[in-house]
């Protein structure tokens, strides 16, 4: 294969800027997919992606254009899936920067552009949705030049929806994106694993980009991180259906199967090389993104525990950003503490476990990881509020802080600043991008933004604001643990860590929500929120009242009183012996409720 005719590229875009639609048009124009087989969001193969209209998983497809071979590596746009984007960019030489002409640059787009620049990729600006009346092409070009510092001389203006000028995108890829560097088949094999998934028949299937050397069916290869060896059983490319090949060359993107049954042996970002002629040095791979959010996952049926563990291992093949470890809850039994990149990431995984693996789970209230400084000088990392030590042994608690960059229309600046203030944000800076939009910089506790910050930001600005954040370290805060007691018993799965100033309002919201979610029992159930031994909020779930006097004559007063006294005595006994049955909906309601009430 002529290496000068290979082009490897990704598409960078914010949600709803038309990335999946542009990918569809490229597949159509190049006849990679026939009209008969074509569906909207063709590369978004998961049902969840189609339902939500977002890309969750990266995808890779080989496209023939003239005498060129293009490898399109599709990427997600949501802030929670930045890790997927970084993996796609590591396997590319260039990127299409897709910007909506009606909305301009968004914060998440900026973050992904910086990732592309760090990888030394060639970036081609593509201005989309020019068919809409509100499109402002010149303003969008100016924004790309001023905000990103990227020249727009080679910018292509298109409508991915109608297909207008989409041919020019292919010509720009051919002209501006460089061919793979140092793509020499004769060198020792160096191939980057940028994704993987589990197949029931073939075992672990890896998506790879070959930088140097070649790989053939029957070759014995090894992972450079752990030295594990396997023989290639199947090779091929996706175009977009899997097409088997005898070999993959330097510069190509394809898949490899080797009947690997143990999912833990494959690590995304690892380098594979041949056993008989190994490479001296592994490829750089990429920096693993650390989870920012932790929650407990417990199977509804305790017999599904091992099945849940195996399912998490399989999902981790294609989503190596999740972490998990075993934990035990007095209320819920055996489960796992799972780490995520955000709330959407968590919801998607929960949905995948339910749909793909048929496992029903209960998720506890999410939390961030705190540094707990003990009075003896030691530091404990706590992500499960139930494990927070007694206050008498704690010197102080540090919580993670982020630097948030918010792009907002000028008319909504006041609303956004108030929201940040309510989230304990520290104002750092503000600058004007142009006459209509500004950039706000705030430092905020990570724990304040993981629940509902993104949704509230969108609702306060009618969907026009966007934000991106980076972790900047830990700061000491006045934090307390709020415990929930049901009928006097502490339910560890409901515990939360929060700032002292908002503890009372959050406790009221929690008790109120539990009162609504837990069905009435045959006895009265107090729902209490406590800090230490102090009760700070209480609700009562009223008991059912059985009408024991319904058969009596109205005049039979003594009998009437006797039956009521008997019922009262029976209820006291039930209250003493009874345990409260908490339905799954109670956990879901706490998870989905806006715990931080709008102030």
Swiss-Prot record:
<keyword id="KW-0547">Nucleotide-binding</keyword>
<feature type="binding site">
    <location>
        <begin position="128"/>
        <end position="131"/>
    </location>
    <ligand>
        <name>GTP</name>
    </ligand>
</feature>
<dbReference type="InterPro" id="IPR004161">
    <property type="entry name" value="EFTu-like_2"/>
</dbReference>
<dbReference type="InterPro" id="IPR035654">
    <property type="entry name" value="LepA_IV"/>
</dbReference>
<comment type="similarity">
    <text>Belongs to the TRAFAC class translation factor GTPase superfamily. Classic translation factor GTPase family. LepA subfamily.</text>
</comment>
<dbReference type="GO" id="GO:0005525">
    <property type="term" value="F:GTP binding"/>
</dbReference>
<dbReference type="GO" id="GO:0045727">
    <property type="term" value="P:positive regulation of translation"/>
</dbReference>
<feature type="binding site">
    <location>
        <begin position="16"/>
        <end position="21"/>
    </location>
    <ligand>
        <name>GTP</name>
    </ligand>
</feature>
<dbReference type="Pfam" id="PF03144">
    <property type="entry name" value="GTP_EFTU_D2"/>
</dbReference>
<dbReference type="InterPro" id="IPR013842">
    <property type="entry name" value="LepA_CTD"/>
</dbReference>
<dbReference type="GO" id="GO:0003924">
    <property type="term" value="F:GTPase activity"/>
</dbReference>
<dbReference type="GO" id="GO:0043022">
    <property type="term" value="F:ribosome binding"/>
</dbReference>
<dbReference type="Pfam" id="PF00679">
    <property type="entry name" value="EFG_C"/>
</dbReference>
<dbReference type="InterPro" id="IPR027417">
    <property type="entry name" value="P-loop_NTPase"/>
</dbReference>
<keyword id="KW-1003">Cell membrane</keyword>
<comment type="function">
    <text>Required for accurate and efficient protein synthesis under certain stress conditions. May act as a fidelity factor of the translation reaction, by catalyzing a one-codon backward translocation of tRNAs on improperly translocated ribosomes. Back-translocation proceeds from a post-translocation (POST) complex to a pre-translocation (PRE) complex, thus giving elongation factor G a second chance to translocate the tRNAs correctly. Binds to ribosomes in a GTP-dependent manner.</text>
</comment>
<dbReference type="GO" id="GO:0005886">
    <property type="term" value="C:plasma membrane"/>
</dbReference>
<dbReference type="InterPro" id="IPR038363">
    <property type="entry name" value="LepA_C_sf"/>
</dbReference>
<dbReference type="Pfam" id="PF00009">
    <property type="entry name" value="GTP_EFTU"/>
</dbReference>
<dbReference type="InterPro" id="IPR009000">
    <property type="entry name" value="Transl_B-barrel_sf"/>
</dbReference>
<keyword id="KW-0648">Protein biosynthesis</keyword>
<keyword id="KW-0472">Membrane</keyword>
<dbReference type="InterPro" id="IPR000640">
    <property type="entry name" value="EFG_V-like"/>
</dbReference>
<dbReference type="InterPro" id="IPR031157">
    <property type="entry name" value="G_TR_CS"/>
</dbReference>
<dbReference type="GO" id="GO:0003746">
    <property type="term" value="F:translation elongation factor activity"/>
</dbReference>
<keyword id="KW-0342">GTP-binding</keyword>
<dbReference type="Pfam" id="PF06421">
    <property type="entry name" value="LepA_C"/>
</dbReference>
<feature type="domain" description="tr-type G">
    <location>
        <begin position="4"/>
        <end position="181"/>
    </location>
</feature>
<dbReference type="InterPro" id="IPR005225">
    <property type="entry name" value="Small_GTP-bd"/>
</dbReference>
<dbReference type="InterPro" id="IPR006297">
    <property type="entry name" value="EF-4"/>
</dbReference>
<dbReference type="InterPro" id="IPR000795">
    <property type="entry name" value="T_Tr_GTP-bd_dom"/>
</dbReference>
<keyword id="KW-0378">Hydrolase</keyword>
<protein>
    <recommendedName>
        <fullName>Elongation factor 4</fullName>
        <ecNumber>3.6.5.n1</ecNumber>
    </recommendedName>
</protein>
<dbReference type="InterPro" id="IPR035647">
    <property type="entry name" value="EFG_III/V"/>
</dbReference>
């Amino acid at each position: 294969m002529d290496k000068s005719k290979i082009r490897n590229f990704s598409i960078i875009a914010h949600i709803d800027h038309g990335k999946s639609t542009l990918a569809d048009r490229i597949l159509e124009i190049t006849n990679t997919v026939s009209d008969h087989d074509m569906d909207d969001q063709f590369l978004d193969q998961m049902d969840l992606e189609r339902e939500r209209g977002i890309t969750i998983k990266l995808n890779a497809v080989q496209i023939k254009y003239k005498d060129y071979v293009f490898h399109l590596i599709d990427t997600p746009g949501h802030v929670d899936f930045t890790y997927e984007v970084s993996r796609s960019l590591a396997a590319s030489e260039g990127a299409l920067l897709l910007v909506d002409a009606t909305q301009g640059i968004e914060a998440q787009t900026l973050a992904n552009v910086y990732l592309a620049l760090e990888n030394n990729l060639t970036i081609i600006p593509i201005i989309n949705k020019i068919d809409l009346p509100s499109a402002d092409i010149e303003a969008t070009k100016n924004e790309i030049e001023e905000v990103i510092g990227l020249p727009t001389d080679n910018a292509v203006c298109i409508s991915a929806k109608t297909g207008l000028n989409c041919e020019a995108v292919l010509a720009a890829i051919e002209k501006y994106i460089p061919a793979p560097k140092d793509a020499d088949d004769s060198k020792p094999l160096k191939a980057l694993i940028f994704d993987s998934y589990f197949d029931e028949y073939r075992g672990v299937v890896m998506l790879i980009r070959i930088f140097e050397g070649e790989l053939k069916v029957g070759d014995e290869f090894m992972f450079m991180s752990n030295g594990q060896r396997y023989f290639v059983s199947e090779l091929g490319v996706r175009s977009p259906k899997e097409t088997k090949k005898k070999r993959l060359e330097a510069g190509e993107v394809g898949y490899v199967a080797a009947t690997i049954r143990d999912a833990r042996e494959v690590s995304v970002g690892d380098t594979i090389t041949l056993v008989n002629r190994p490479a001296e040095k592994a490829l750089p791979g990429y920096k693993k993104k650390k989870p920012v959010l932790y929650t407990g996952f417990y199977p509804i049926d305790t017999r599904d525990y091992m099945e849940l563990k195996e399912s998490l291992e399989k999902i981790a093949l294609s989503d190596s950003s999740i972490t998990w470890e075993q934990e035990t809850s007095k209320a819920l039994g055996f489960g796992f503490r799972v780490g995520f990149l955000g709330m959407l990431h968590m919801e998607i995984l929960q949905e995948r476990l339910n749909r793909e693996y048929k496992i029903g789970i209960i998720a506890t209230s999410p939390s961030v990881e705190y540094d707990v400084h003990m009075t003896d000088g030691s530091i404990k990392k706590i992500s499960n509020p139930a494990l927070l030590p007694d206050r008498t042994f704690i010197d102080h608690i540090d919580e993670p802080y982020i630097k948030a960059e918010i792009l907002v229309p000028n008319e909504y600046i006041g609303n956004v600043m108030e929201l940040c203030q309510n989230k304990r944000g520290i104002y750092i800076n503000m600058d004007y991008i142009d006459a209509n939009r500004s950039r706000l910089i705030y430092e905020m506790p990570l724990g304040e933004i993981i629940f509902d910050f993104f949704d509230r930001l969108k609702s306060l600005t009618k969907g026009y604001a966007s934000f991106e954040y980076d972790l900047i370290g830990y700061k000491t805060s006045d934090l307390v643990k709020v415990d929930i007691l049901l009928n006097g018993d502490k339910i560890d799965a409901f515990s939360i860590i929060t700032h002292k100033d908002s503890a009372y309002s959050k406790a009221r919201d929690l008790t109120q929500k539990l009162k609504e979610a837990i069905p009435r029992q045959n006895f009265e159930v107090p729902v209490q929120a406590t800090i230490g031994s102090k009760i700070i909020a209480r609700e009562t779930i009223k008991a059912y009242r059985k009408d024991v006097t319904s058969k009596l004559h109205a005049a039979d007063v003594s009998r009437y009183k006797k039956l009521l006294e008997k019922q009262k005595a029976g209820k006291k006994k039930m209250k003493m012996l009874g345990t409260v049955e908490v339905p799954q909906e109670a956990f879901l309601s706490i998870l989905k409720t806006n715990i931080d009430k709008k102030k």
